[in-house]
Amino acid sequence: MKSYIYVHTVSADKVESHGLVWQARKELHKAVRKVLAASARVLRSPFADTFSTVDIEDHDCAVWLLLRKSREDSKAARLEAVRELSEAHHWHDYQYRIIAQACDPRTLIGLARSKESDRRFFLPPPPLPSLKEDSSTEEELRHLLASLPQTEIDECLQYFTSLALSESSQSLAAQKGGLWCFGGNGLPYAESFGEVPSATVEMFCLEAVVKHSEIPSHCDHIEAGGGLQLLQRLYQLYKDCPKVQRNIMRIIGNMALNEHLHPAIVRSGWVSIMAEALKSYHIMEASHAARTLANLDRETVCEKYQDGVYVLHPQCRTSQPIKADVLFIHGLMGAAFKTWRQHDSKRALTENVVVDENRYTTCWPKTWLAKDCPALRIISVEYDTSLSDWRARCPMERKSIAFRSNELLSKLRAAGVGDRPVIWISHSMGGLLVKKMLLEASRKPELSALINNTRGMIFYSVPHHGSRLAEYSVNIRYLLFPSLEVKELSKDSPALKKLQDDFVEFAKDKNFQVLNFVETQPTFIGRMIKLHIVPVESADLGIGDLIPVDVNHLDICKPKTKDAFLYQRTLQFICETLARDLKN
């Protein structure tokens, strides 16, 4: 047990200076008596008669008692200690600092994931090492990237890494493919396809490190190369660039999947950074932090949230029992958050907007659904649509619905999806992925729980029978979908027809509940072309209600208000389908 004494300096007039030494000695002796008394009570050890306990305060003793309780062998006692610590809001600063300096990583992470924890529990990150002479963050990032293994990685990552290491800012900006749209904004990106991205080498290198961090062995190399400190330097440097900060948090979240790296992550101060980010009003920032902290919290979380899997609710430790899961799967060139924003075209594409939850939300599943159904775990997933823009540089199988569905299925199982009742909610091509995932799971005995626990699904403008998009020119098709996806979406696609036939038979056999929404308005493609991407006949699964809505393809999953029909009908379906499970 360590004890800490904090001495605060005060100014003194020269006239009073003669008694300063005596006064300081008196205060130090008083502090020592209090610390020894508190320690004696906590440790239940004999207390020397030469020290007095007259000055000890009850709340000082409580600090040490809670600290000891947080290290008990009993998990229930440890959890109770963290809960009590998180509810302490009227201590003196030094008492929070005692906990901050003396608690173990398990307690610190628990406090970071506790909604009401005082920020004074979290010490600032340790000072960063100085940059090498004549070096820069760009050069350090290049050096880190170059130190990562370049063998046994796929063609896409090889190509991306080599570009980041060899090209200049100007030549990188001239690469006008999809290289700059990891988790991009979909059709709005297509509208600006002719514009040159304003990006830097640092950002480009960072994108490559994100992809490397998905490989567990590469995370070890990132840590060994000082990556945790370098990423923290970049995080501080780009405080006003949310995209850079989110990519950095993606890397830390991926590294946190490896439990042997947890001590290094904690020592480098990332828990304090994530604790602050978790309280952010920016939903994306808070969700990235929540994923990282959940991966660090092995005390209460057994699931692991891999890259692209985000828990929207609950993001903190909670006593509320979770009885079912609701999953949100975006469409091709969509995103885990912006696809599910409230309809508001003027606000929607603002990168750094902070909004009043009662007036506007950048992610309605987190803001509205979590409040209406607190017993749900709400997950939104993101798959890497930008890979499909790397033209012939990437293996073709990475672009197929089959490949994407298997990859997502593996990630969702790691997150514990299938262990409790599930409803799947999808937009556009995301619905095809849901169908393919469930069919694949039905063929694997080890995934039988996922099938048995699937209660139903909601499809927002899913092209079950193909899309008219495939009828248009090659240039337009390329802007929206890569060639393989276009072929799979065409009305005469054998793969799409087989997927539809197999799923309908399977869904009827399992008696899944289904709700279909479909757009009735065309969508602007670029600046001059309007296209009805998923017509009514294509969105008809053949099972469940089919509801036409007077919106376009992008807005079919974006309710205008919480009282709007789109949201209320969605909420009604969820509550009715899970009624029995939520009552248990």
Residue spans for each PLM region:
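Short coil/turn segments at secondary-structure boundaries
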Residues: 224-225, 267, 338-344, 391-395, ...
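Serine-dependent carboxylesterase/thioesterase catalytic core
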Residues: 330, 344-345, 388, 398, ...
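Conserved beta-strand elements of beta-rich interaction domains across eukaryotes
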Residues: 331-334, 383-388, 429-431, 439, ...
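Active-site catalytic motif of lipid deacylating hydrolases and related acyltransferases
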Residues: 332-422
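Active-site-adjacent alpha-helix of alpha/beta-hydrolase-fold enzymes
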Residues: 520-552
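Post-His helix in hydrolase/transferase enzymes
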Residues: 558-575
